[in-house]
A protein has these predicted regions:
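Non-catalytic N-terminal regions of enzymes
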Residues: 1-164
Length: 164
């Protein structure tokens, strides 16, 4: 009787640059319970001294996103679970026109699970809580604001006390 050689089990590599990735347990919960009535979206804003230039804010957003590759995703609904899929598009800055913290659903095509908007002198960063927590969103919003101010002032800007 021939003995079968057992093949060693291959470990599944978790590559950050993969086309999709699983949500952590908290993100699974937020994705499952979120909807129009319970958005699970929160906002961080930066208030400036001058009116926001939308074109420069768009350039700052495109410049910021490569520093936060985990944010370059879209939320998708699979057969059994939600997951993040790599999003190759660039997000678009929009003028704030509706109520803040609106639902960001997985059924909206190529949308990102965050939104960057402006109103007057204010830059808004709204994010689905399944993507990041307050600290991650604060880092993103701070870096976005830094890039924006660098483009406006045409010189490097360092946020004071950036230990968060």
């Amino acid at each position: 009787e021939k003995k079968r050689e057992e093949k060693p089990k291959k470990k599944r590599l978790r590559i950050q640059g993969a086309a999709w990735r699983r949500l952590d347990n908290t993100a699974k919960l937020f994705a499952a319970v979120s909807g129009e009535d319970l958005s699970s979206v929160f906002r961080i804003s930066a208030v400036l001294k001058e009116k926001v230039d939308p074109e420069l804010l768009q350039r700052a957003l495109v410049r910021t996103l490569p520093e936060f590759e985990n944010f370059r995703v879209k939320l998708r609904k699979g057969f059994f679970w939600y997951y993040f899929e790599t999003n190759t598009r660039n997000p678009c800055v929009e003028e704030e026109q509706r109520a803040p913290c609106r639902f960001i659903g997985p059924h909206r095509g190529a949308r990102f699970p965050f939104r960057v908007s402006y109103y007057g002198c204010r830059i808004n960063f709204e994010v689905f809580h399944g993507l990041t927590d307050g600290l991650g969103s604060l880092r993103f919003a701070s870096r976005l604001t830094e890039h924006y101010l660098e483009l406006v002032k045409k010189l490097p800007v360092m946020v004071q006390g950036r230990e968060f």
